Each structure stands twice: as structure tokens, then as C-alpha cells.
From Swiss-Prot:
Substrate binds at L73, C74, H75, M110, E111. One of its GO terms (biological process) is Mo-molybdopterin cofactor biosynthetic process. This is Cyclic pyranopterin monophosphate synthase. It holds the Pfam family MoaC. Pathway: Cofactor biosynthesis; molybdopterin biosynthesis. Catalyzes the conversion of (8S)-3',8-cyclo-7,8-dihydroguanosine 5'-triphosphate to cyclic pyranopterin monophosphate (cPMP).
Amino acid sequence: MLTHLDSQGRANMVDVTDKAVTSREAVAEALVRMLPATLQMIVSGGHPKGDVFAVARIAGIQAAKKTSDLIPLCHPLMLTSIKVHLAAEGDNAVRITASCKLSGQTGVEMEALTAASIAALTIYDMCKAVDRGMVIESVRLLEKLGGKSGHFIADDAQVAP
């Protein structure tokens, strides 16, 4: 059963009033593929708009905090930790990993996914003038801890211990 639908099939925000407050964490990722020259410009600090990784990191953090404003049925959450890590992968990609934590009554998967997605979109925005062929791919949940549904880890996920 989809939890965001009532008995008549109408969308509603899930009532979490009676759920226990537990520690919750989620990790998500996104990959941005680009021309090798674009990645070289980013990692060398030669982008005329500034530090692409720093701007994307801040954008991801802001996005996690704004998730309930962007996704209609998400609860507003008091996140206690948001981390966004960006790293060059090979000679033509940036891997973004975002993690969110809180003690609360609902999970933080959407916040982690939103952080990774917006960080990827920010890279695209900052670099589109030099590389319109960039591709954002593999936006996915890597790991989820806490809550009633327990621990989830993607089959091929490589998550830090």
C-alpha cells in the first residue's frame, strides 16, 4: 500500500504523530558525466565562475533543508547533519554523495536525494557554457538507517563504514 494515499486514493501527508523518535540517516548519490576538459577546469580551479565544488556543496546543503518546500508531501524536518561530498571520478565525471541525519519520526531519504540532485544540477548550471552535453545520471539512494523499515543498502553500493 502506498502510504501517501488515503482510502479513497487521494494524496495526503502521512501522519507520523504516533511514530517513535529514532535516529535516522540516509545516503544518496548522483553522477555528472562531462568532457574531460570540463572536469579538468573544475578540479584545477580554472572556472571563471569560481569554485564549482564549493558552490555545488552549498547548493546541496540548502536543498536538503528545503526539501519539504519542493516535494509536496514531505514533512519539514529538523536535520541535525547534512554532508555533501564531491569528487572527480576518472577523467570525465563527478560523483556526489550526500548524507542527512536527524532524530525524528520520519526518514531523510528524500533530503539526501534532493541534496545530491541539486548539487548535480548546480554543476550543470555552472559548466553549461563550456559543456552542454553533460549528463546527470545514477541519482539513487545508497543507504538508509533507522525507523520501522530498518536498514537498507543498495546491492552495489560502496558506502563509507
